[in-house]
Amino acid sequence: MKDLLSSLSKGIPFEPLPEHPGLDSTVPHAPGRPINLTLNEKKLAIKNSLRYFPNSLHSILANEFLEELNKYGHIYMYRFRPTHYEMKAYPIEEYPAKSRQAASIMLMIMNNLDREVAQFPNELVTYGGNGSVFQNWAQYHLTMKYLSEMTDQQTLTMYSGHPMGLFPSNESSPRVIVTNGMVIPNYSSHKDYERMYAQGVTQYGQMTAGSYCYIGPQGIVHGTTITLLNAGRKYLGVESLIGKVFVSSGLGGMSGAQTKAAYICGAICIVAEVSPAAVKKRHAQNWVMEVYSDLNELFARGSCSKEKKPLSIAYQGNVVTLWEKLVEEKDITVDLGSDQTSLHNPFNGGYYPVQCSFEESNRLMVQEPTKFKEMVQETLRRHTTAINALSARGMKFWDYGNSFLLEASRAKADIIKPGTDGKEFIYPSYVQDIMGDIFSLGFGPFRWVCTSGNPKDLEITDRIAKELIEKLRSQPGVPKNVQQQFNDNHLWISQAGEHKLVVGSQARILYSDCIGRSELAVAFNKAVADGTLSAPVVISRDHHDVSGTDAPWRETSNIKDGSQFCADMAIHNVIGDSFRGATWVAIHNGGGTGFGEAINGGFGLYLCGSKLQEEKARMMLNWDVNNGIARRSWSYNDNAENTIKRAMELDPSLKVTIPNHTSDDLINSLNF
């Protein structure tokens, strides 16, 4: 395999020019994008694409790239899609890299583009409809070349998928620094993104797509499991969801976690998905047990709630059709409801109108974008009306941070809470009601990848994590709300292996706090050093975390001091991670709620067993979590204030400004 992967070090293949492989008919493809470029902007898009190639090839490639631009709305450079090796995460020793740190990044990039992992692998999109690793295949080849030849005295800078080059640094510096979608704030609209992406100058990195840290749908299963468990506790007053019905939408890279999480919680889950390919993939991976395209047949399974057995069902069709049918079916009780359509990208494949077929929608969004937008907004109004009707009958609904409430309000749906000047919705975001408190305790989606590719190494890390949680929860003075987190996470890691969550690299996610993350990293590093693990481990996290993301409609929606629209936390986080030991860092515009609606960042840290990497892990993880807790404490969150005070007691060098609390009576007594 080393010989096969040796081509990664050669860069863009143009001597000789490879034959065009065509589109792979065995994988789904991104829908075409509407072209909103002027003639001069089109010319610039072609010129920008050709600069990756010698002048002798320009006359050959220019027409080809123009055809791609006109047909797909973007230049992917399909001719250069690699076909002589399988795109997947290979064991780290098989990568032709001088730096093992760089080799670990190559592994993570290829995992993000694995056909079993990525949503649209030919278009370099990992999840979310437009969450891109690169803008085109030339960038992929050039990046892999740089990573192959770099040393630990260099840093690769990535500008929205484009490898700007290798720059001298030192061993303590990050090997790669990634930015995606960074634009001047006044130019951060959907239209700006569409124009700049078509021109090849920016991309939407989503979260872990553009930071090379995606681990398949498992990456959100644990968080979804926690959300559902706590929704049951908060809304239904139950500790178990056995016999409860949960309805939502989406079986994509992130949303696909819903069926698995609901099954783990014991619920009956019905998820609608319009893409036949997405349904087929999740069914083949056993993340969905049953598939229906006829709602009458599906509802004939209504007795399953009485059987008290967990069940995951996919409805292949539009979620609004499902919701409206549920309104008609008075005998079916829906206990919990949400939505995970990709409404950060509402008019280009993230949300499909109920009035026409999946195929017709893909045509309309390119050829008749104005009509398509009108149909989407009408569908959003119907969607909201149906949810309101079921909520009136007792269903508890929440926004899953996908901009559903925001886009429904823009469509003039009945979604605004009266008396709030249009600033609040009648339904909560799940961060406001559930995950915000968990983040404020310092718990978030920590994850790791075993670079050996050996499932036995993953089993060992699961055992290490389980034993560590047992140790942490048995210590004296653990607050009750923290104890509950430990208990939920212990159950998760105890059962993770049997739930067969791995898709792609040998990876695991585990919600953990600052102490837990640091101790896990140290334990993994020592296990590599003493040979318990056969190869290094890469640790990371979702950007959707305690400190990683500023997003007023999701991660910071429970910030109460008016700073939910400020991005200082996410920016400070990535800067702080970079000089405290991260192997690579990333900062993005967008994330799950849309371009211009969030700033989010992440990191990767390579653990090879050395003392230096242990020190880096301790230093960086302490900052990576406590930064967000400090910010949340300053914005009047009691959980965060108590958590940061405990952190300061444990570490005398940590000194955080604590707010003085003002009496509401005093404020209200002022003569405004």
Curated annotation (Swiss-Prot):
Which EC class does it fall in?
Answer: lyase
What protein is this chain from? Probable urocanate hydratase
Residues annotated to bind NAD(+): 128-129, 206, 253-255, 273, 318-319, 340-344, 351-352, 400, 592
Q: Which domain of life is it from?
A: Eukaryota
Q: Name one GO molecular function term.
A: urocanate hydratase activity
Family annotation (Gene3D superfamilies): Urocanase like domains (3.40.50.10730), Urocanase superfamily (3.40.1770.10)
Any single biological process term in GO: L-histidine catabolic process
Report any Pfam family annotated for this entry.
Urocanase
* Similarity section: Belongs to the urocanase family.
Which reactions does this protein catalyse? Answer: 4-imidazolone-5-propanoate = trans-urocanate + H2O
- Which organism encodes this protein? Dictyostelium discoideum
